[in-house]
């Protein structure tokens, strides 16, 4: 079965300013995949993964480029993919119980969005579904990363739709935020 991979992760500018930039970044990716049913059918397969930092995306500094293939999720050309890059501080905030909370909340948001968008033109529906998942991820990040004593990781920019329409596709996403800038290259293999 084909999978979606990160082919390359490049640190253009690590997060932080001043003294905060003296330490390297450890980054990880959140990915949501949801299959888009046709007609009035709402049955859908979803997947939520948390990948990294591991040895492949830790201690990243300005100009670092990591080219190890890192598997993220199953590939389905009829699915929507939304990804978010996170900078880890201390322990990873999206782990254990938090991962289950993300998965459950995203699945609820996805099912509701599928129901709301039945009958819409495909491009309009995909946009609405991607926006729903992006908003849900941002809300979850606020809870699990922004509440004192709950977490301290930092989202690098907003969640983004990853478009890989064919097995020969590659896509580059630009993640900018928290004064950091990363470029991720994704592929199907």
Whereabouts are the PLM-identified features?
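Eukaryotic beta-sheet cores, primarily in C2 and C2-like/PH beta-sandwich modules
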Residues: 29, 60-120, 141-148
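C2/C2-like lipid-binding beta-sandwich modules
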Residues: 1-28
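Membrane-interacting helical modules
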Residues: 116-138
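Extended low-complexity, serine/threonine- and proline-enriched intrinsically disordered segments
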Residues: 25-37, 85
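Peripheral membrane interaction modules
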Residues: 152-159, 163-189
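Solvent-exposed serine/threonine-rich low-complexity stretches and specific carbohydrate-binding patches
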Residues: 39-62, 159
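A composition-biased, non-transmembrane "mature-region" signal
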Residues: 2, 14-17, 32, 36, ...
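Short beta-strand-plus-loop segments that form exposed binding edges in beta-rich domains
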Residues: 11-17, 85-90, 176
């Amino acid at each position: 079965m084909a999978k979606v991979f990160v082919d390359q992760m490049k640190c253009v500018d690590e997060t932080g300013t001043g003294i905060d930039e003296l330490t390297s970044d450890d980054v990880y990716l959140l990915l949501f995949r949801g299959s888009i049913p046709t007609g009035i059918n709402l049955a859908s397969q979803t997947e939520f993964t948390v990948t990294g930092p591991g040895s492949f995306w830790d201690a990243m500094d300005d100009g670092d480029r990591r080219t190890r293939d890192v598997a993220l999720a199953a590939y389905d050309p009829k699915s929507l993919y939304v990804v978010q890059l996170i900078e880890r501080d201390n322990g990873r905030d999206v782990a254990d119980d938090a991962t289950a909370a993300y998965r459950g909340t995203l699945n609820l948001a996805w099912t509701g969005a599928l129901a709301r968008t039945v009958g819409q033109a495909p491009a309009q529906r995909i946009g609405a579904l991607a926006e729903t998942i992006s908003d849900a991820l941002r809300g979850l990040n606020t809870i699990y990363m922004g509440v004192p004593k709950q977490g301290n990781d930092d989202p690098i920019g907003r969640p983004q739709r990853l478009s890989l329409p064919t097995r020969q596709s590659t896509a580059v996403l630009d993640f900018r935020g928290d004064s950091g800038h990363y470029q991720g290259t994704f592929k199907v293999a």
